[in-house]
Amino acid sequence: MEHSKKHLGTFYGVGVGPGDPELLTLKAVRVLEACPVLAAPQTASGEMTALNIARQAADLEGKTLLPLYFTMSRDRAKQQEAHRAAADAVRPYLDAGQDVAMAILGDVSIFSTYCYLMDILKAEGFPCVMVPGVPSFCAVAARLGRSLTEANTPLHILPGGGEGPGETLDLPGSKILMKSGKNYPRLLEELERRDWLDRAGMVENCGLPGERVFSSLKEKPESSGYFTTIILP
């Protein structure tokens, strides 16, 4: 896309951390307060969790709010359609020279919807900037009082959803299973089969309302929400 020499807005991806508003960085607050347009994922029920966290740490009065809708379907075509639609919603503001900040849970580079939009808009010539945030699994480790890795110990970040981690569970070193809620019963079976329940720690909704902390899974908690992270030392 040709934009000639006209001024274009910048598309910022801003990590707001896992839930505790005190974990927003100074840079995240500055960028959120400076941008006239704020975008954020919105659920089917109307919740904008990332934006709600940001509101508790930054002054967002008078901003244009732009809800973005993303499908939970595993169908790749539907996912790509949602990404294009979200990019279409952001583009007019950037084209008009307005900066847009997209609030993202955790860190903007880890399982982030921002990156899909960034790829689309950057290819069209729009400037894009990523503002890192505190990753959810770092907050979970702190909540559990555990080290994630030391010395030469490898650290693996694995998706807990979809088809599950499978054989990657047997990789050497520490493992982080992110967004494990939907696959939780199956993951419990895998951990029990390996006799790992006692050493697995889990936090559900870290820093958010309804937070639950389990220093081990030997009691087999019955339910687990979408924002669930399991750590295996």
Which sequence ranges carry the predicted segments?
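Class I S-adenosyl-L-methionine
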Residues: 1-21, 26-127, 214, 219-220, ...
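A contiguous loop/helix-start segment that scaffolds small-molecule binding in enzyme catalytic cores
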Residues: 11, 100, 169-233
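General beta-strand structural signal in soluble alpha/beta enzymes
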Residues: 40-41, 67, 102-104, 130-133, ...
